[in-house]
Amino acid sequence: QNVEEIQVGEKRGREAIELLFYNLRDIYMIVENAVSEIERINPSTDDKEEVKRFDRMKNFLSKPNNKLNFIHNLSYGYFFYGVQNYYVTKNKQDVQYDINVDVTAILVVNKTSKSLFSPRNSLLGHYFRHLYQTVQFIAREENLQEDEKYNYAKMVRAQLSDFEQALLYYNSLSVMGKKWITPIGIVDIKKMCLIARFRLIKNMPYYFEYFGIKPGDFFEVEKEVWQTHGGNFFEIDLIN
C-alpha cells in the first residue's frame, strides 16, 4: 500500500499521516489523564474488595516503567483497533486488565470523541506490514554486503516523511510493532533491531513534541554505538 492511498476524511497521503500522528498523540494524552484519574480515586473503605483492587492497580502504576509501557500499549491499541475492540490483555486476573476496563469506563463517561477512537487498522495495517516486509527482505538478502543492505534501506527511509518516521517509532513501541525494535540495547550493528541497524528514523525532527517514551532515551545504547562508528543515529540528536 502506497502512502498516497491512505485517506482520513479529506486528508490524503502525507497529510493523512500527519493527522494520524496527532490523533495518536491526542489519544495518548487522554489515556494518560485517565490513568492519573484512577491513581487519584479513593474507593469507599466499606467495600474491601474494591479497596484491594485499587491498591493493586495503584501499586502497579507506581512503578514508572509499568505505567509508561501500559499507557503506550493501551493508547496505540485504541488508536489501531478502537476503544471497544482492544485490551492490553484478556487475562482477567492480570492487574492491567482492571486498569484497562477502568480507563475505558472513564472515556465512556466523559463521552470522548468517537471519531478520535475509531479503528485505524484498515488504514495502517497493510502499510506497516509492507514496510516491514521490504526492510526485512533487505536485511535477510544473503548476496548483499552490510553496506549494500544499508544503502537499500536508506532508499526506503528516503521515501518516509518526518511524520511517517515518527509514526513508525510509536508503532514499534506497541505490541503490534515490537518486531521493529527486537532486540534492543545491542552493541553489534549487524545484530541490532531493524530500526537501529538501518537508522530508519534518522530524520525524526528534534523540534517535535514527542510524548511518552522519548526516542533519544529509548535508543540510548544504539546512539552511542553509531557514534563510535562515526555516524549519528539521528540527523540532529534527540537529547530527550
Where are these regions (language model features)?
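Intrinsically disordered, low-complexity polar regions and short flexible loop motifs
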Residues: 2-240
